[in-house]
Every structure is written in C-alpha cells, then in structure tokens.
Amino acid sequence: EIPLRLVGSEMCIRDREYTGYVAHVCDMKSYFDENLKLIDEKNLNALFPKKNPVYTKIRDDNPTRYVTGSSVSNSLLADGCVIEGTVENCVLFRGVKVKKGAVVKNCVLMQDTVVEAGAELDCVVTDKNVRITADKKLSGTKSFPVYVQKSHIV
C-alpha cells in the first residue's frame, strides 16, 4: 500500500510482493518470542532461505566450543561461543560464554554476553557485552522476559 502523501509526488514508487517469513517485532516480548521461534529449523530456513542469502558484517571467529560436561539442547548458537554449562531452548549470538555450572534456559543472549559460573537465567534477554556475575539468579516469564541493558554487569 502506497502512502497517500506520496501519490502524485515526483517520486518514483515501486513495489514488490514478499511472501516469505515475516515477524512483527514491536516490544520486548515479541522480540523474545520471535527469536525463540528461530530454534525451529523450519522458521530459520524460511527467514534465511539458501537461495537468497543474507550478507552480514564479517567477524571471523572459531566454531562454538562445547567443553566436556556441558549440555546443550534445542538451541541455536552462533560461532565463537564457549559452552561449559547448561543451555536449553536458547538463542545465543556470537561470542557468548556460558561458564561451568551456569544454567541458561529460554533465553536470548546477544553478542559477547558472559554468564559466569553458577549463574542461573530463565526467560532473559541480554543486549551485547553484558556480564552476569557468578551465582546470580535472573528469572522472568515467557510473557514478561527480563531485559539486561547493553554493557551492564549484573
């Protein structure tokens, strides 16, 4: 739909129908929900189809490292992560570190978040460069996830 203020202007307006995966992200809950939906491979492939690759800023990093004794289930992890603890039903961005004894469930952890030993997170969204210190417990709900601001230490 073309906005009425542009009709009759000197602008050249074109449109193209898009029938692929769409998500309406308007608040923290929808951001949380839509990220966790990407754990389902069907949704991930619909958003990032192989025939139309999405090119992003390159950050050459090591593959994710799973240390002996770690546990990961039903999660989507980017490169550069180091997992020593437990991760369940999460989306982890590049460079996230989950230390030994830490438990992370139903979370979206952005780039370079560090979850130190013994910390427990459930229904948490962290912005990038966040540090959750040892033995801290943060718990939200699926309808009201906890959000930690960029570069904060909790």
What spans do the regions from the language model cover?
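Extended, small-residue-rich solenoid/repeat segments and analogous flexible loops
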Residues: R14-R94, V103
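Residue-level recognition of well-ordered secondary-structure positions
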Residues: L4-V7, N35, V125
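Structural signal for interior beta-strand "rungs" in well-ordered beta-sheet cores
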Residues: D60-V154
